[in-house]
Amino acid sequence: MKIVISPAKSLDFEKTLPNNQFTKPAYLKQSKEIVSVLNKLNPKELSELMHISDNLAQLNWQRNKNFTTPFTTQNARPAIYTFNGEVYNGLDSYSIAEEKLAVLQNKLRILSGQYGILKPLDLMQAYRLEMGTHLPINEHKNLYSFWKEIVTNDLNKELKNNELFVNLASNEYFSVIDTKKLKVPIITPEFKDYKDEKLKIISFFAKKARGLMVRYIIDNDIETLDGLKGFNYEGYSFDANLSKGNTLVFTR
């Protein structure tokens, strides 16, 4: 099984790491190309490009200037212990037992505007670059064009025939994958909560549930569709009536 998730805007470079394991990202050459383009922009231009405040633009301008290779444990940090949004709160990577890290590293992939695709223990430096940012890179009109073939080929190399491929990423990030060229079907879980007596996708809860499902898969080393349907963390359960085809709906 392979799982893809989105990155997070919020980053944590302060918390003490639970172990000293790390790997190197596969596409640093491409990341350097992107940063070299970003480094031609001043903070005001970054603010306009990314639709962010002047303060955030200044911070990310400095991050781009600080980008340096090779990545080491002194200047970078494993992605899974750095991203810090709701998905990652649900996953709670710091409490994953060290003997489960190999399962996590094998199954999970993080899509990224700056790094393309990351394994959990891949080192990363601080950045902010959403996949939907309209940033031309050389002959590519945007980041989707720049990364699509690279990310799709990377996944296809790893995916075995009949292996489950689980999409727990947002549409913004999942769109970087050329799904027509993927050699396996895509399983897309959805998470709905009752609100005002109606079932709805509530963004805050749905994001956390994506992380919870990753954690469920890792905890139980899930490999099958039936195993996936058994997801029951924090009150969710599979709803066969609402599910259709490869879209699995979980409600609570």
From Swiss-Prot:
**What S-S linkages are listed for this chain?**
none
Q: Which organism is it from?
A: Flavobacterium psychrophilum (strain ATCC 49511 / DSM 21280 / CIP 103535 / JIP02/86)
**What family is this protein classified in?**
Belongs to the UPF0246 family.
Name it. Answer: UPF0246 protein FP0718
**One GO CC annotation, please?**
cytosol
Entry's Pfam families? H2O2_YaaD (PF03883)
- Name a biological process GO annotation: response to hydroperoxide
Q: Which PANTHER family match?
A: PEROXIDE STRESS RESISTANCE PROTEIN YAAA (PTHR30283:SF4), PEROXIDE STRESS RESPONSE PROTEIN YAAA (PTHR30283)
Checking HAMAP family in the record gives:
UPF0246
Instruction: Say which domain of life the source belongs to.
Output: Bacteria
